[in-house]
Amino acid sequence: MQPVAPPRKAYGSTGRYVGPEYDHGPLPDVAGRVLELCGTQDGCRYLQRVVETGTAEDVLLVFRSVIADLPALMCDSLANYICQKLFEHCGERQHLAAIQTLARDVVEVARNVHGTRALQKLIDTLTTAAEMGAMRDVLLPHVFLLVQDGNGNHVVQRVMHDFPQEYNQFVYDILTNDALVEKISMHRHGCCVMQRALDHACEAQKTLMVAKVVEHSFPLVRDAYGNYVVQYVLEMPLPGIATRFTRTLRGRFIELAKQKFSSNVVEKIMNKGEKDALDAILDEIIACRDMAVLLQDPYANYVVQTALVTANDAQHRQLVALIVPHLALLRNTVYGKRIMAKLYREPAPGTAALAPGSTAPQPSPLAAGARHSAPPEGAHSGPSAHGTPHGNPRGSPVVERRRIYHPRQ
């Protein structure tokens, strides 16, 4: 037997909620029970309908009934919906009253799973200078705390998205503070805020943010979350951005190549294709006295592979000359075989494939065919053997084009 569908609820022409469970009558008849109705599913729906289709007096009556308990209602699993509906249909005076009421409890509301949605809705509805200025003043002392919270960070993001520069600058002042930029960028949720801030920034805000990320890049590239911020900046269409990072990181690329997260950034800089940046890294690799260590390192070997792919012919010959003496170390490792596959490069007419004086075997089927066939099982094509999250032996995905890191919440 097919189940019988429950009767649909409806609203009468007078604004009365009509249904088998509730028949509340006209709004004035239940004016003293608004808070009670906010706590029930049917009552909450009734009030939302009243606010949506009722008169301005109806909206004002509901608002006055809930304003004193607004923080608690915004955090309620049911009542937050009537709060959001009120924010959509209220005017400036009610918005200012709501902001004033929230002032003492804004952190608790922003960090609550229901409260954050209601607060974001309130921010969405603020359009006047007085409203945005009031919200700025309430949130200003708490930005650093909120950007590190799984729910609160979305409130900060909404301010950056919705408010013009004059009223969202206070967020950028915190994000670019020299004492805070590393702490925020190296936080699970803070790194997301930094990336979204770059998306929503005006030109002046973006310029300062990029400068701060470059300035603090050495600790950031070594961090599990901070490296994503650096990679995000590297993906931005900014002329010479890779070269700016190399000026800060110069002399440290061998150290960074051997670390889990920073090695991703080193490859990202090399793949950016800026000659000065690439030359700076290749010079350090070629000058390294411990090539055998790099070749066998679980992270640096990928940097060496990228170096072989991105180097010009002269640099490639120098790298080959340094690697050939260590071929015996490479034959029994997966990444060693990948390095060997990149040793051979089709020479340009009139040039040699290897550095003068070096000897290497003729390209084996593995070496010669690797560039023209599918990669070994578990490997990946492209300039970085670990450029995608799948099968990455380092467990640290490289941020691809404009990818935003979204940690699990």
Task: Walk through the language-model features, giving the residues of each.
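Eukaryotic gene-expression regulator signature that favors modular helical reader/repeat domains
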Residues: 1-409
